[in-house]
Amino acid sequence: MKAFEFLYEDFQRGLTVVLDKGLPPKFVEDYLKVCGDYIDFVKFGWGTSAVIDRDVVKEKINYYKDWGIKVYPGGTLFEYAYSKGKFDEFLNECEKLGFEAVEISDGSSDISLEERKNAIKRAKDNGFMVLTEVGKKMPDKDKQLTIDDRIKLINFDLDAGADYVIIEGRESGKGIGLFDKEGKVKENELDVLAKNVDINKVIFEAPQKSQQVAFILKFGSSVNLANIAFDEVISLETLRRGLRGDTFGKV
């Protein structure tokens, strides 16, 4: 039973995707006692899984699984394995480690649409939930993508079988994706995107509190948000529930 549970009202909470950059297993075990109910996915950032003892990776995944949380390795690790011609080995290792989902992306590399489609299919055929990511890691490359380009790729991935599509925002949330160089949401582009994709299938990377507030006020508490720092999960949950000044009386 939660403290002050008499204040709770039923509401539809969107997905919360947390970024794990190498948290210790025992920390994860204790940490989940505080916020495990509010996490849906955990991404082991970029290629961090490849530099940690595999038994530790498995231990952490099991702690997350105990809370019904799906874990997946960062898209950069997929891109690295794919560029080495080791996609099958990558999927096999993901299965052995206990990952239930994978991320297909081209943020640091170039993958054709056909290759992207086939990678999604192969991952799905191997029993994984598939999240894809739209956007480039380097701002100078990402800014070459128009909002129409992003919309087309989101719909392409969903048609190819992806379960969710993540909009690139990186850890900074500045000068990339739907954010300007100050980190403010590009409202005009967001409006166009919202009219042309299934928002319920889109996950917005929103590392900054101001961005989380903007998306919640725009779409409501059911908006899907990613790149949430492990120590910001409770903060985000209060924003979703109107238990913090930024959203009080507005959700």
From Swiss-Prot:
Q: What pathway, per the record?
A: Cofactor biosynthesis; coenzyme M biosynthesis; sulfoacetaldehyde from phosphoenolpyruvate and sulfite: step 1/4
The record's top EC class is lyase
**From which residue to which does any coiled coil extend?**
none
The protein's Enzyme Commission number: 4.4.1.19
- Could you confirm whether the keyword Transmembrane helix appears in this record? no
A GO term for molecular function: phosphosulfolactate synthase activity
InterPro entries cross-referenced by the UniProt entry: Aldolase_TIM, Arch_ComA, ComA_synth, ComA_synth_sf
Q: Which reaction does it catalyse?
A: (2R)-O-phospho-3-sulfolactate = phosphoenolpyruvate + sulfite + H(+)
Protein name, per record: Phosphosulfolactate synthase
- Species the sequence originates in: Methanocaldococcus jannaschii (strain ATCC 43067 / DSM 2661 / JAL-1 / JCM 10045 / NBRC 100440) (Methanococcus jannaschii)
